[in-house]
């Protein structure tokens, strides 16, 4: 069975959720549903998957420190990698950067599980079933 590399896309400014989100504090870093941010909720979702590699988090340079702080607060990931986007250019370049990184650091055949940090998944059990398929 191929290894699964969770890739959490946490870039962007969250400008469509203004005034809640700001350029330096975008929606993926906000606590909108419960006591965890959308990024933290996504990390928890990925950490509950069986036999996955440590998460790869793609984030803009300006959010690197708060991202690290939020990940470390969870204490759910002993290991993780933050991959910095020098410039935000939307989803495709972020996924390409993650694929290139994974190709250099993981075994051939590793499957990338792309997880936008600002998505809300209500049925965790079904999510896990679909990923397992």
Map each language-model feature to its residues:
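Conserved N-terminal catalytic core of the sugar/cofactor nucleotidyltransferase
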Residues: 1-8, 15-26, 31-116, 122-128, ...
């Amino acid at each position: 069975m191929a290894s699964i590399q969770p890739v959490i896309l946490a870039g962007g400014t969250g400008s469509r959720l203004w005034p809640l989100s700001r350029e330096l504090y975008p929606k993926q870093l906000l606590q909108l549903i419960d006591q965890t941010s959308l990024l933290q909720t996504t990390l928890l979702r990925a950490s509950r998957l069986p036999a996955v590699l440590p998460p790869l988090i793609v984030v803009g340079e300006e959010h690197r420190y708060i991202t690290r702080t939020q990940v470390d607060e969870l204490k759910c990931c002993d290991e993780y990698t933050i991959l910095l986007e020098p410039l935000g250019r939307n989803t495709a370049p972020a996924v390409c950067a993650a694929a290139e990184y994974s190709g250099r650091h993981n075994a051939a055949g590793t499957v990338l599980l792309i997880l936008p940090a600002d998505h809300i998944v209500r049925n965790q059990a079904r999510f896990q079933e679909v990923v397992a398929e």
